[in-house]
């Protein structure tokens, strides 16, 4: 065994994990490369965009900035662990509100939304937008994301029925002009959809550009 590797033990999405890792490995890389949890995305790799957001002992953190050895003996929750029995209310609200577009920022946004509603059951629009400040979205202008969190808030507080989340095709069968569920929205909201950097295959080669 490589003498430079260190042993870590942690719990990820409720499951105990024991691995030997390089001390310099970041938590985001550990989740993606060692555990194949591709829902944790890497965007800026500098702690700015929030696509790599996870919960560490219940606190929202950017996993690209945290050495995995700092997470030793911690409990980690990723997007894959949010909806343990299918999609969570928050994930379903993102789909319903049209907050899932390209989907790359979606897992991090849902992790942030989960934290917001866990810490305050009645956040207003101003607080929601402020608390999303660490997560960047290129597509939506945040309007649909805020609407999704407001919808989840109302459902979780029983101010609105979860029945509104059911996907309904208009009686006419015509969908033009109607809001319907995107065909890949569930995969994006669950963090399961593969992007280029998520794809792996046996004996795959890696190229590093040197300038």
Predicted features by range, described:
Residues 1-164:
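Signature of N-terminal electron-transfer/Fe-S-associated modules in redox systems
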Residues 154-211:
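Flexible, low-hydrophobicity surface segments
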């Amino acid at each position: 065994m490589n003498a430079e590797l260190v042993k870590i033990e942690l719990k990820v999405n409720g499951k105990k994990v024991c691995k030997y890792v390089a001390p310099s490995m970041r938590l985001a890389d550990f989740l993606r490369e060692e555990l194949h949890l591709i829902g944790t995305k890497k965007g800026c790799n500098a702690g700015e965009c929030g696509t790599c957001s996870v919960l560490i002992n219940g606190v929202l953190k950017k996993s690209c900035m945290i050495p995995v050895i700092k997470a030793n003996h911690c409990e980690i929750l990723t997007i894959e662990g949010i909806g343990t029995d299918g999609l969570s209310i928050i994930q379903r609200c993102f789909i319903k509100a049209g907050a899932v577009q390209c989907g790359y920022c979606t897992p991090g946004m849902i992790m942030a939304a989960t934290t917001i509603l866990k810490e305050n059951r009645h956040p207003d629009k101003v607080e929601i937008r402020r608390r999303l400040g660490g997560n960047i979205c290129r597509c939506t202008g945040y309007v649909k994301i805020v609407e999704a969190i407001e919808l989840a808030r109302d459902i979780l507080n029983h101010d609105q029925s979860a029945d509104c989340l059911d996907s309904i095709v208009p009686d006419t069968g015509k969908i033009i002009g109607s809001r319907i569920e995107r065909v890949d929205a569930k995969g994006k909201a669950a963090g399961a959809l593969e992007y280029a950097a998520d794809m792996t295959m046996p004996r795959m080669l890696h190229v590093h550009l040197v300038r």
